[in-house]
Amino acid sequence: MTNAISITETPNELTTEIDLASPVEIVRLLRQCDAQIYNGWKSEPGLNDQEILERLTRLVEVVTHALKSRGRQRVVISGAGTSGRLAMFTARAFNRLLATRNEPQIFRYLMAGGKAALIKAQEGAEDNPHQGVSDLKTILSDIREGIYIGVTCGFSAPYIAGQLDWALTQPKMMSVLLGFNPVSLARQRPIENWDKTFLEVARAVESSPRGLVLNPLIGPEPITGSTRMKGGSATKWILEAAFAVAFARAFPMTRRSKGCLLGPLRGEKNTDTLRRLLWQYEIAREQTYQQRDAIAQLIVWGGDALLSRRSICYLGRDSFGLLGLIDASECPPTFGATFEDVRGFIEGGWPALLEDDEDLSSHGPQYRIRLTDFGKNTLPSVKSPDLIVGILEDGRGPEVLRLLKDSAAQGARTALLTYERPSGFAAKKSNTLVVTPHLEIHSLIPGVPSYAEFSTKLILNALTTGAHILAGKVYSNRMIDLRLSNSKLYYRILGILRILMGVDEPTADKCVRKSLFDTDSLTEAQSSARISALVERGASAEKLVPKALLLATGQFSHAQACEALRREPIVRKILETHLPKS
């Protein structure tokens, strides 16, 4: 591997002009990029390669043993951002499955920043390895035997590095690192207030007899560094496939249920079973993108909403409503979206989400996520060109359907994403749309509709990514209005300035700091402020990257950059005038 840039931070050569593409072309480009999840990238080992499948089989074996332990072992999945949300999503699904058999619910999840981070990014949370260790020790306070799975797509999150480092010291724990870079490209930069780099920890996992690195190379993201897309999808594939096979081994099935792929395994090898399950995700991808024109229409409507400073709202139930919440939560750090730009609401609110008595609604408006909250607080002001999207696997959900009808009556555009013929909702007017992907198989095993969920994730990611492209938040295939919420994004911002403006890293750093501190002349304290201090200030910074880009041209003072962006809020348009010509 000669490329010194992390694969997850490398621009995808397929999408270098995605910002100039029509909505239909955007969907085609996303379809091509997503094909790399299964088919692989260049000559690197991919998800369908034997060596990766054999490593994944090792995970199946230890999870099978944990499931058979009758509660004496734990499986802990941990991540930051999208990885943490998918950790929760997966643990929730398989604990529900265990509950149907009256088996101990052994799956646990951890997320940098805690439960509040499921909805809103918590600044700097993933940069603290010590907090990661503390959280892991707490969740394993009564049982220190089992499997720890740390998910970090780019092999970069200090929160995960700390947990892996500690887990390796536990004699009865298996430590698994899941991501999509070669170990050699794990982050080597120093971690604040810690004595190791992520690269050192990754190598320790790789060399440990109780360690396992799962890192199929799935290629760069369609939008550079946006690992919520391919990285998130591949994470879902890997965890669900491994856990489903382990479940089938621990609790043998006597028959295959209707609409499910997995049945009695009998003499089938785990590698063959995994290959079959993963292939079905690829089939689901193909069948989802057959809805190209409908997805493109969603992108058009989403772009109209954002350009008019209106909203995209998701209304759903069960795991499909949760996917809407996850997609919405990813937009502020990725695109600099405001709280109101993209919202998610779920039937039952926090109790349905967490399945415990904790309700975070009192934390503030962003955490009021019930459908009744939408009806009470959002619906009264809904109008054209707001886009309200219902997400119902079976097309049934009286409260969601009623809110869609009420929204349409007030002039909003409405859409229903479903996998069955909808009951009580039809696209009879020009402002309504039904998207119905025709999937061959919906579920891995009963109660885990993995393939329909993956299809939903693809469509929601395409909608919000495409809408933000139309709203001018992407230049070439790079985010140009992301928020500075952790050290990973700080280094990504420096990379954006270096590549787009042709400046060196010290100059890029100086422009970011000037933008962040609202000044043309940095003080000594501002020049030497640690990254953690920049992240803390970056939580409330508006147009941080666009201002830094304009400052890097040498043609703007800070005040002039602010005025230029005030006159033209679509970031891409103003940058077109001032970025260096290639």
Residue locations for each model-derived region?
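Conserved N-terminal alpha-helical segment that immediately precedes and caps sugar-phosphate-binding
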Residues: M1-S582
